[in-house]
């Protein structure tokens, strides 16, 4: 496995199933899988920061990122590759040291350039072909956690070490 120094993720279609709910007053709702919070835990446990890159700009994503202590949040991103390159420059790392999980067309350029690329099983086939790591879960089913655990090689010994 490559030495990863940053984990980046999309939100819709990864942390969620891609569905969006609106109430009668226009409020947007998203359903997050709480299992994905363990992905943040494991990354931080190994000293690796996590960043969100999403094309949407919503208060609910900001609140979720804040609650989980996500290190970097970029909303309303049009060009995810450029945003990731800028962050890498700030951190003094290169894209080969980044693991990224995304699920659709606006993720493709970045998926092609990072050290480890993950794609949920629910993504279109032409996006899944960009994945360098096999993921079984679909978006909204804890795929971010699965991705982080595979990228970092989390195993039973790691789990036992944190519960003792």
Swiss-Prot record:
Pfam families: Hydrolase. Keywords: Hydrolase, Magnesium, Metal-binding. It catalyses: 3-deoxy-D-glycero-beta-D-galacto-non-2-ulopyranosonate 9-phosphate + H2O = 3-deoxy-D-glycero-beta-D-galacto-non-2-ulopyranosonate + phosphate. Binds 1 magnesium ion per subunit. Substrate binds at residues 34, 54-56, 64-67, 80, 106. Changing residue 37 to A: 2-fold decrease of the affinity for 2-keto-3-deoxy-D-glycero-D-galacto-9-phosphonononic acid (KDN-9-P). GO terms for molecular function: hydrolase activity, acting on ester bonds; metal ion binding. Homotetramer. This is 2-keto-3-deoxy-D-glycero-D-galacto-9-phosphonononic acid phosphatase.
């Amino acid at each position: 496995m490559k030495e990863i120094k940053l984990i980046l993720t999309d939100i819709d279609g990864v942390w969620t199933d891609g569905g969006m709910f609106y109430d009668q007053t226009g409020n947007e709702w998203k359903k997050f899988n709480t299992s994905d919070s363990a992905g943040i835990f494991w990354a931080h446990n190994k000293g690796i920061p996590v960043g969100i890159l999403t094309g949407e700009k919503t208060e609910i994503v900001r609140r979720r990122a804040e609650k989980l202590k996500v290190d970097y949040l970029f909303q309303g991103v049009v060009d995810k590759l450029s945003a990731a390159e800028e962050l890498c420059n700030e951190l003094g790392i290169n894209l080969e040291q980044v693991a990224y999980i995304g699920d659709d067309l606006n993720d493709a350029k970045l998926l092609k350039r990072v050290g480890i690329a993950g794609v949920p099983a629910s993504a279109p086939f032409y996006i899944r072909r960009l994945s360098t790591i096999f993921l079984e879960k679909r978006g909204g089913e804890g795929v971010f956690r699965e991705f982080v655990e595979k990228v970092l090689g989390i195993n039973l010994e790691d789990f036992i070490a944190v519960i003792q």
